[in-house]
């Protein structure tokens, strides 16, 4: 993503705030306990399911914040502390069912009550009063004894994601007293940005009690690829109970539950079932072998390096839609923040520094010396903005970045240094200022909306969907995320599909032929699944070792089934690791990582783009506490960043370093997260000590294949501060440990069966350790980690 500062529509999206504020007037009032004095019950006033969406959940749609209608009001129990901003809205941010902008100071366990009068919501927040049927805890001792751990081979075999055609055996343990047990299988439908989420029944399998044991067992064969859910139903003394997924949230993901152990609950009317999730992928799913060895250098080209001043945008000449542009005279300026009083104009994304492809070419040796072997650049095609996701011409490099020949030259020079280049594009939308749309009549081509007039004769007419009944040009078409600068493309248009991937000279093929080693595809959830299935076939036919990476922020299981993408931008990893480095309990943060280990096919799990900073989120140092005005906080944030990057380098997947993170570049939300790299020859002050540490961590990963390819199981130790993992690659073992406490610690762990006694060597400092009676002692620095490697060389 590129325009929104969060995954889903925030209140600051241009135009949206004004419309929503006009849609409703709401107030915060004292709470009335649920059920204290019922009026006549009525139907819910809104047909759509409503959610609380705000800063407490990244403005996302999450079942943990789903409002429940009961008689005369909507209710939600929350456990929050501090001030939050939120709206009431449906899963799709529909204009008709998005209400208010509320600011509320929460104080622990409370109930939110929402009533409607004349179509306008009134919010009441007070002491916990609503009895949620989904949270009722059973009192029957047999029901309370129900136990299943989806990550234990004793309860589910085989582990994790399975190939289509596989049989999976599931076990449920309990005290005596169950008269009947059933395994319930359902198949998930997930569409768009999680707006559509449902499960359709597939099978009910009678479970058999294992002779002589208080365990019930059933086996089910998954014939087709997909994401499935399962839960258990049991009867005890004539009453039905469920055993289902837990309530722990998964970052960015609508569904509650991270698998592992679940919870028991009595069956009641209207409850929401939380299935354990099961991924079933294509037996022939292959990911390019090089992906697990990749270390990305992630570049926002306009802000990396100006290698050719002759192609810089020129104020008074270069146009931005029907306006002008701004060019910074000083490379070290901060990006402009429109409407902030910094002296800039009021236009978003029209300030430039002059970064270009020649600048990337000039710094290939720097990237190689850092240890990166894969460059991912945000789009470089012709576009009006500085971010280039508003594509004007998919076939040509933006003239302010260089030429098509420069792109090929970049890939050739990169290859000489052992570096691949991944291209980026959005096939979901174009720019309004483009050859295809041409809202501002800046092109000679016959655009579909040239000069704000729909042209049915345009060769691009069916690439967009128009509503000619509207008189306001902004309402005659749909802009992605409500942004009129980004008209959504009609992905069902045969002509557009031919252009995007179907034709011999399609965009997909063209840039692979020009040297790209793969594609990162923007806002992948907004594009239909069948589009991606056809697209993947073209990519692999054109270049079998090309990598396909989706931009998804939530649980990406549906995109990693072998029929669409190889990998994804791992925002779940980002949030988990930055939370952990910030001091969140290790067990809480690591649960989301364990969910991915279980849910994702192994070939995809080892190729995930494990990032920390991005062009869409605040930089890591900002998240970790450096807000620019406290030297002590800045130093602490840098050490926390070292911990986060240590975790990146010892974990499966492909670490991604966002340009400048390695030298301490900081910045909050867009546009401050897109600051320039502080090159010393331009007067910048890169943090060379941090750079040396990052180089050492990347070199450690490169020198030890066990850190890239080694197997990984559940942690050997997981407490409030420490995570200890064992990795194995053939006869080589790595034991890794991280510590988010402010003090150093010493832990002793029992090694897995087959692990050698030692000696184990720490590749960072040369220290050694040897196990005694199968137990290994590790000394872990404060806010950092330790790794020791032993066994066969």
What are these regions (language model features)?
Residues 93-124, 246-267, 771:
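Structured interaction patches on ligand/partner-binding surfaces of diverse proteins
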Residues 157-160, 166-171, 715-753:
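Carbohydrate-binding surface patches
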Residues 115-123, 295, 771-793:
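C-terminal beta-strand-rich structural cap/linker in extracellular carbohydrate-active enzymes
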Residues 604-634:
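Active-site clefts of carbohydrate-active enzymes
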Residues 294, 301-374, 379-514, 535, ...:
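Substrate-binding/active-site clefts of carbohydrate-active enzymes
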Residues 192, 408-420, 428-445, 506-509, ...:
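Active-site-proximal helices and loops of the catalytic beta/alpha 8
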Residues 131-177, 264-282, 286-289:
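Non-catalytic, glycine-rich low-complexity segments
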Residues 41-83, 91-106, 173-225, 235-256:
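Aromatic-rich carbohydrate-binding modules that target alpha-glucans
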């Amino acid at each position: 993503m590129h325009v929104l500062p969060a995954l889903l529509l925030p209140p600051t999206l241009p135009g949206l705030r004004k419309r929503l504020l006009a849609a409703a007037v709401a107030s915060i009032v004292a709470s009335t306990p649920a059920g204290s004095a019922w009026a006549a019950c009525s139907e819910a006033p809104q047909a759509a399911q409503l959610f609380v969406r705000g800063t407490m959940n990244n403005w996302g749609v999450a079942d943990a914040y789903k409002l429940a209608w009961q008689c005369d009001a909507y209710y939600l129990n929350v456990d929050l502390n501090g001030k939050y901003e939120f709206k009431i809205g449906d899963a799709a941010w529909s204009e008709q069912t998005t209400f208010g902008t509320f600011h509320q100071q929460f104080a622990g366990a409370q109930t939110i009550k929402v009533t409607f009068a004349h179509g306008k919501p009134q919010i009441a927040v007070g002491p916990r009063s609503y009895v949620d049927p989904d949270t009722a805890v059973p009192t029957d001792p047999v029901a309370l004894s129900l136990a299943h751990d989806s990550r234990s081979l004793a309860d589910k075999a085989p582990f994790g994601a399975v190939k289509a055609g596989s049989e999976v055996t599931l076990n449920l343990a309990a005290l005596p007293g169950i008269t009947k047990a059933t395994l319930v299988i359902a198949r998930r439908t997930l569409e768009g940005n999680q707006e559509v989420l449902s499960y359709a029944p597939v099978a009910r399998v009678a479970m058999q009690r294992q002779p002589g044991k208080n365990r019930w067992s059933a086996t089910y064969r998954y014939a087709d690829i997909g994401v499935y859910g399962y839960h258990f139903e049991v009867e005890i003394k004539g009453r039905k109970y469920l055993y289902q997924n837990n309530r722990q949230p998964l970052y960015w993901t609508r569904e509650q539950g991270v698998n592992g152990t679940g919870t028991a609950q009595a069956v009641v009317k209207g409850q929401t079932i939380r299935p354990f999730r099961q991924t079933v992928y294509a037996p022939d799913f292959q990911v390019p072998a090089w992906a697990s060895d990749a270390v990305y250098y992630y570049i926002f080209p306009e802000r990396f390096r100006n290698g050719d001043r002759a192609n810089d945008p020129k104020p008074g000449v270069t146009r931005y839609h029907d306006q002008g542009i701004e060019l910074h005279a000083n490379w070290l300026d901060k990006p402009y923040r429109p409407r902030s009083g910094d002296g800039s104009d009021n236009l978003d994304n029209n300030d430039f520094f002059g970064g270009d492809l020649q600048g990337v070419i000039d710094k290939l040796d720097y990237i190689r010396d850092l240890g990166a072997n894969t460059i991912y650049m945000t789009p470089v095609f012709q576009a009006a903005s500085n971010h280039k996701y508003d594509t004007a011409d998919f076939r040509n490099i933006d003239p302010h970045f260089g030429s098509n020949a420069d792109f090929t030259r970049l890939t050739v020079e990169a290859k000489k240094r052992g570096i691949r280049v991944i291209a980026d594009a959005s096939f979901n939308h174009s720019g309004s200022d483009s050859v295809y749309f041409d809202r501002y009549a800046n092109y000679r081509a016959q655009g579909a909306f040239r000069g704000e007039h729909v042209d049915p004769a345009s060769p691009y007419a069916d690439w967009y969907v128009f509503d000619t009944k509207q008189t306001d040009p902004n309402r005659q078409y749909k802009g992605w995320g409500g942004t009129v600068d980004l008209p959504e493309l009609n992905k069902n248009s045969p002509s557009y599909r031919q252009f995007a991937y179907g034709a011999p000279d399609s965009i997909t093929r063209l840039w692979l032929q020009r040297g790209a080693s793969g594609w990162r595809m923007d806002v992948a959830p907004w594009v239909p699944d069948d589009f991606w299935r056809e697209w993947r076939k073209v990519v692999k036919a054109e270049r079998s070792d090309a990598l396909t990476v989706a931009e998804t922020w939530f649980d990406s299981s549906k995109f990693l089934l072998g029929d669409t993408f190889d990998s994804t931008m791992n925002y779940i990893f980002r949030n988990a690791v930055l939370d952990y480095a910030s001091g969140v309990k290790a067990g809480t943060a690591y649960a989301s990582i364990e969910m991915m280990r279980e849910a994702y096919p192994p070939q995809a799990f080892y190729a995930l783009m494990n990032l920390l900073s991005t062009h869409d989120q605040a930089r890591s140092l900002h998240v970790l506490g450096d807000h620019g005005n406290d030297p002590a906080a800045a130093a602490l944030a840098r050490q926390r960043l070292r911990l986060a990057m240590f975790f990146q380098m010892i974990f499966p997947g492909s670490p991604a370093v966002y340009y400048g993170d390695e030298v301490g570049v900081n910045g909050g939300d867009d546009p401050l997260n897109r600051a320039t790299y502080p090159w010393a020859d331009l007067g910048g002050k890169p943090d060379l000590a941090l750079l040396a540490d990052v180089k050492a961590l990347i070199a450690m990963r490169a020198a030890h294949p066990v850190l890239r390819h080694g197997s990984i199981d559940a942690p050997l130790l997981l407490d409030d501060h420490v995570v200890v993992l064992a990795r194995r690659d053939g006869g080589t073992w790595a034991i890794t440990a991280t510590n988010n406490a402010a003090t150093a610690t010493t832990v002793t762990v029992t090694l897995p069966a087959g692990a050698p006694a030692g000696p184990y060597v720490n590749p960072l400092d040369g220290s050694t350790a040897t196990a005694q009676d199968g137990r290994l002692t590790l000394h872990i620095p404060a806010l950092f980690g330790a790794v020791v490697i032993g066994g066969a060389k």
